[in-house]
Amino acid sequence: LTLGRDGMSVSKRDLITTGLHDLCAGALTPWGTFLVNEEFPFIADPQSRSGWVWEIDPATGAQKRATGMGRMSHEQEALSRGDWYITDDRGNYQYLYKFVPDNPRDLSTGKLYGLKFDRSTNTGEWVGPLDPMRPEADMAAKAGPPTAANSFSKHEGIVRSKRGDGVVFSESGSGADPG
């Protein structure tokens, strides 16, 4: 949308992409493209082409998969110190992910890690690299299934911290183990 001079009216609307599934929040890149997230769980349809972060050039509408960021139910990502931090909105418990690109402007290759968190000490360790085609299953195999003790409860937004030395994100779940 392009806003009018009054900030209240819309002077132009451009549709720049179609064909993506269950879109959620995204992020701007330092080089002028933007990222949109498919909040589509891999487990729902392993054969589907959905469940990716897509990088879109607003000038041309060109879109490409950021395959290095993994296939999962993406919520949002934030850039800090050259690495992308990714929230997963699959359900009650999930890990926080970190993508370290091989080339800062190419989100198709790099290493993907999951954070195994310890709530009792408020510390964690990055586990990986993970298989970007199935990061949730790979992380569960390497760190154990996500629980209230070692992961986070229903990620929502994520942004770079004010100091620029990390990220801030929110959880919207109850934090209690189901069942």
Where are these regions (language model features)?
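Sequence/structural signature of beta-propeller domains
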Residues: 1-179
